[in-house]
């Protein structure tokens, strides 16, 4: 199980910033995308509370998909980092549950 707070700490430990995290569905696959915008930027569109709520929602999806450990492992091992115009995309393997989540 992962909480939004743990996801936030994972981002801080890896990259030192509170990067925005989004879910994307592409060609029947789910990706977690760590975006290049981050909470500490003056132009960041979310308040700290909205940011925390977003991370909690994403953590809840990851837990439902049994994908929290996949995400944690990928972030810990990757050499990629978010940069302007390029997110870090992490595919979440839904296994046999794919049909339940992908319409």
What do these predicted regions represent?
Residues 1-22, 86, 90-103:
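Intrinsically disordered, low-complexity linker/tail regions enriched in Pro/Ser/Thr
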Residues 2-4, 47, 68:
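General structural signal for secondary-structure boundaries
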Residues 2-3, 29, 72, 83:
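Secondary-structure junction/capping motif
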Residues 6-10, 57, 70:
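Exposed alpha-helical structural elements
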Residues 8-54:
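Charged, amphipathic alpha-helical linker/scaffold segments
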Residues 17, 21-25, 58, 76-79, ...:
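Basic helix-extension-helix modules of the SAP/HeH family
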Residues 49-65:
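Short secondary-structure subsegments characteristic of cysteine-rich extracellular domains
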Residues 61-103:
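Intrinsically disordered, low-complexity, Lys/Arg-biased terminal tails
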């Amino acid at each position: 199980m992962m909480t939004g707070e743990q996801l936030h700490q994972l981002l801080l430990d890896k990259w030192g910033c509170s990067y925005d995290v989004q879910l994307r569905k592409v060609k029947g696959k789910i990706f977690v995308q760590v975006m290049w915008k981050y909470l500490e930027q003056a132009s960041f569109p979310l308040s700290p509370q909205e940011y925390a709520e977003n991370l909690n929602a994403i953590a809840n999806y990851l837990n439902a998909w049994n994908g929290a450990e996949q995400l944690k492992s990928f972030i810990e091992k990757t050499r990629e980092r978010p940069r302007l115009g390029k997110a870090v995309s992490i595919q979440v393997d839904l296994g046999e549950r794919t049909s339940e989540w992908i319409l």
